[in-house]
């Protein structure tokens, strides 16, 4: 797989402290599901976050954040964050924003 293993290790350190999180390979990378809903992931050197439309609009004001678009059609409420915008405690802040949105979604059972 072609995604940042260093970023993945850092994500695992954080999400492993959350309940009901499982990894799943998708989008050519890896995603983490919280209660069956994608909360975050990695594609190449980008952190993928599911923030909801309001928080995503705020995140898109950051110069190192862009719409999540791997098909030619952006996914509303999702963003791609450059790995270098995840340094230090920034990664945990990004992940907590996604968690805050996803933990209010209905649980998905597969």
Positions of PLM-derived features:
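Charge-dense, helix-prone N-terminal extensions
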Residues: 1-110
């Amino acid at each position: 797989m072609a995604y940042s293993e260093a970023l993945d290790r850092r994500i695992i350190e954080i999400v492993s402290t959350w309940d009901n999180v499982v990894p799943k390979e998708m989008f050519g990378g890896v995603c983490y599901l919280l209660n069956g809903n994608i909360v975050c992931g990695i594609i190449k050197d980008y952190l993928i976050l599911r923030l909801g439309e309001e928080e995503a609009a705020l995140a898109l004001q950051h110069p190192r954040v862009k719409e999540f678009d791997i098909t030619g059609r952006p996914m509303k409420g999702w963003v791609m964050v450059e790995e270098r915008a995840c340094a230090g405690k920034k990664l945990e802040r990004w992940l907590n924003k996604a968690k805050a949105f996803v933990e209010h979604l209905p649980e998905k059972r597969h």
